[in-house]
From Swiss-Prot:
<dbReference type="Pfam" id="PF00329">
    <property type="entry name" value="Complex1_30kDa"/>
</dbReference>
<dbReference type="GO" id="GO:0005886">
    <property type="term" value="C:plasma membrane"/>
</dbReference>
<comment type="similarity">
    <text>In the N-terminal section; belongs to the complex I 30 kDa subunit family.</text>
</comment>
<dbReference type="InterPro" id="IPR010218">
    <property type="entry name" value="NADH_DH_suC"/>
</dbReference>
<keyword id="KW-0520">NAD</keyword>
<dbReference type="InterPro" id="IPR022885">
    <property type="entry name" value="NDH1_su_D/H"/>
</dbReference>
<dbReference type="InterPro" id="IPR029014">
    <property type="entry name" value="NiFe-Hase_large"/>
</dbReference>
<keyword id="KW-0511">Multifunctional enzyme</keyword>
<keyword id="KW-0874">Quinone</keyword>
<dbReference type="InterPro" id="IPR001135">
    <property type="entry name" value="NADH_Q_OxRdtase_suD"/>
</dbReference>
<keyword id="KW-0830">Ubiquinone</keyword>
<dbReference type="GO" id="GO:0030964">
    <property type="term" value="C:NADH dehydrogenase complex"/>
</dbReference>
<dbReference type="GO" id="GO:0050136">
    <property type="term" value="F:NADH:ubiquinone reductase (non-electrogenic) activity"/>
</dbReference>
<keyword id="KW-0813">Transport</keyword>
<feature type="region of interest" description="NADH dehydrogenase I subunit D">
    <location>
        <begin position="214"/>
        <end position="600"/>
    </location>
</feature>
<comment type="subunit">
    <text>NDH-1 is composed of 13 different subunits. Subunits NuoB, CD, E, F, and G constitute the peripheral sector of the complex.</text>
</comment>
<dbReference type="GO" id="GO:0051287">
    <property type="term" value="F:NAD binding"/>
</dbReference>
């Protein structure tokens, strides 16, 4: 394979971030495997993108994992149907591709490996031998694209029903309900679906019992109050002890990534709110930032601060629900009612600013929907005066309670290696002592201008530590909001850029060119340059990211959404084996997840 640096947007090179092309890891790879072993792809992801031969994939992955400052986390893994992609000059011939996104904590750098595949040979070796969390990602990639991962321990459907036919993210798979035959649920089909959901321990390498006694197999969910959504865990029990378990997800899957291929860059924004439905504007942030990278838009300072302010309000809102429901899972009811009182005050601020409460869809490509209304500062001031004392009450009344401590300290505990192996992020990772918060490590939207601390645990992540870190994160978010209130910049709420969407309305009555642009961008959608873009943010539950591929049209060619809850649920069996069922309930409460974030 010839070494080749290809820039898909050479005509717009002023906006091309080329720092990642000079990343030291490129030289390390060339020194080890030779100068002609790879194709290095220039993108707007800010990440070195290296196409490797399928035969060298595991060797390259192992090399990166053993470097002096190693790439210790598999952050994401998925695929792409390349067959209809027109802008791919200089890239290896491929009908399909698989990408592997690795993170080095010590370097604070990423690398993305890509493997090109032909349609008649969709096979690639499993990555689970290097990174155990590749398991779910490979299962999902197989069911969405039909790519087989040789050597995978259990390559079966994950998000779709077991009886589903076809691979939905292929370009030749229908994207609309009207393209399917009418659905009918006959009695025979219902029986077939129920039979398909029957758990068979042998399929998972489990024994039904020992010489002396049988194991019990218990369904926890998908409609159990402690499963926090439509989520099923099949437990293998020896009395009350959990011998093993199998999480079963997908009941909340809505095809969010497929929808991205049928919506314009602008009209997809409301869908982002519903990925993690408690996060509100936090969900919009990585998407609009990734699109702005494609467009080459730099937003005004006022926009950055407004976005940070809304994100931190939603972070507090989500954390309050998480902390109170965790306490409820342990057995106390009162904090839930306290939390909903406090969350109402947050919604008062959010609704006054955006016009909506849970799903504002308020961020825009190049800015926000409208400027801050009169009186926003008074509402925020009232909340900031109220909340700190309430946090003290939560700690004193519940979180310092000896019963709660006894139920949660040392439960579902794991260390740094386990957290990295399973792709844990957010408080789940920082509780192990690893200081990695994207707002500090890789600042975006002006976070580098704010004074705040990152709470970090002492080396072991257990249920209690994870919750207490979230409490301290609340205090830090209040610090950030105080700075937003006191230092809100003057200026426009949208960037003056041709791809800002919607364009400034006031110009449409003065210039025919801007009138035409406004009409096209609102009705048809803005056309983004052909390239790839990536943005990760510190969301409410860990790191959330969007990896966008544009083929030079009004819609995304491929929208990949990486969510933190997905990785955290995959880790459940490792964390709870040998524990009691009651410990599992506490652990589920400590993870902080919603199933929409898992299933997308």
């Amino acid at each position: 394979m010839v070494n080749n640096m290809t820039d898909l947007t050479a005509q717009d090179a002023v906006w091309q971030t080329r720092d990642h092309l000079d990343d030291p890891v490129i030289g390390e790879l060339r020194n080890r495997f030779g100068p002609d072993a790879f194709t290095v792809q220039a993108t707007r992801t800010g990440v070195p993108v290296v196409w490797v031969k399928r035969e060298q994939l595991l060797e390259v992955g192992d090399f990166l994992k053993k470097l002096p400052k190693p790439y210790v986390m598999l952050f994401d893994l998925h695929g792409m149907d390349e067959r209809l992609r027109t802008h791919r000059d200089g890239l290896p011939a491929a009908d399909f591709s698989v990408f592997y996104h690795l993170i080095s904590i010590d370097r604070n750098r990423d690398i993305m490996l890509k493997v090109a595949l032909s349609e008649n040979d969709l096979h690639v070796p499993t990555f689970t031998k290097l990174f155990p969390n590749a398991n779910w990602y490979e299962r999902e990639t197989w069911e969405m694209f039909g790519i087989t991962f040789d050597g995978h321990p259990h390559l079966t459907r994950l998000l779709m029903p077991p009886t589903w036919e076809g691979h939905p993210l292929r370009k030749d798979y229908p994207a609309r309900a009207t393209e399917f035959d009418p659905f009918e649920l006959t009695k025979a089909k219902q029986d077939l679906e129920m039979e398909a959901l029957t758990f068979k321990p042998e399929d998972w390498g489990m024994q039904r019992g020992t010489e002396n006694e049988d194991f019990m197999f218990l369904n926890l969910g998908p409609n159990h109050p402690s499963s926090h959504g439509a989520f099923r865990i099949v437990l293998q029990l020896d009395g009350e002890e959990i011998v093993d378990c199998v999480p079963d997800i997908g009941y909340h899957h809505r095809g969010a990534e497929k929808m991205g291929e049928r919506q314009s860059w602008h009209s997809y924004i409301p869908y982002t709110d519903r990925i993690e439905y408690l996060g509100g504007c936090v969900n919009e942030m990585p998407y609009v930032l990734a699109v702005e990278k494609l467009a080459g838009i730099t937003v005004p300072d006022r926009v950055n601060v407004i976005r940070v302010m809304l994100s931190e309000l939603f972070r507090i809102n989500s954390h309050l629900l998480y902390i109170s429901t965790f306490i409820q899972d342990v057995g106390a009811m009162t904090p839930v009612f306290f939390a909903f009182t406090d969350r109402q005050k947050i919604y008062d601020v959010v609704e006054a600013i955006t016009g909506f409460r849970m799903h504002p869809a308020w961020f825009r490509i190049g800015g926000v929907a409208h400027d801050l209304p009169r009186g926003w500062d008074r509402l925020l001031r009232d909340f900031l005066d109220w909340m700190p004392k309430r946090l003290d009450s939560y700690e004193k009344a519940a979180l310092r309670n000896t019963i709660l401590k006894g139920r949660s300290q040392g439960v579902a505990a794991y260390g740094k290696k386990e957290a990295l192996d399973w792709g844990c992020t957010g408080a789940a990772l920082r509780a192990t002592g690893i200081d990695f918060d994207v707002r500090k490590s890789r600042p975006y939207s002006g976070y580098e201008n704010f004074d705040f601390e990152i709470p970090v645990g002492g080396g072991v992540s257990d249920c209690y530590t994870r919750v207490m870190l979230k409490v301290e994160e609340l205090r830090q978010s209040l610090r950030i909001l105080e700075q937003c209130l006191n230092n809100m910049p003057e200026g426009p709420f949208k960037a003056d850029h041709p791809l800002t969407t919607p364009p400034p309305k006031e110009r449409t009555l003065q210039h025919i060119e801007t009138l035409i642009t406004h009409f096209l961008q609102v009705s048809w959608g803005p056309v983004m340059p052909a390239n790839e873009s990536f943005q990760m943010v510190e969301a409410t539950k860990g790191i959330n990211s969007y990896y966008l591929t544009s083929d030079g049209s009004t819609m995304s060619y491929r929208t990949r959404i990486r969510t933190p809850s997905y990785a955290h649920l995959q880790q459940i069996p490792v964390a709870v084996r040998g524990s009691l069922v009651s410990d599992l309930i506490v652990h589920l409460g400590s993870i902080d997840f919603v199933m929409s974030d898992v299933d997308r």
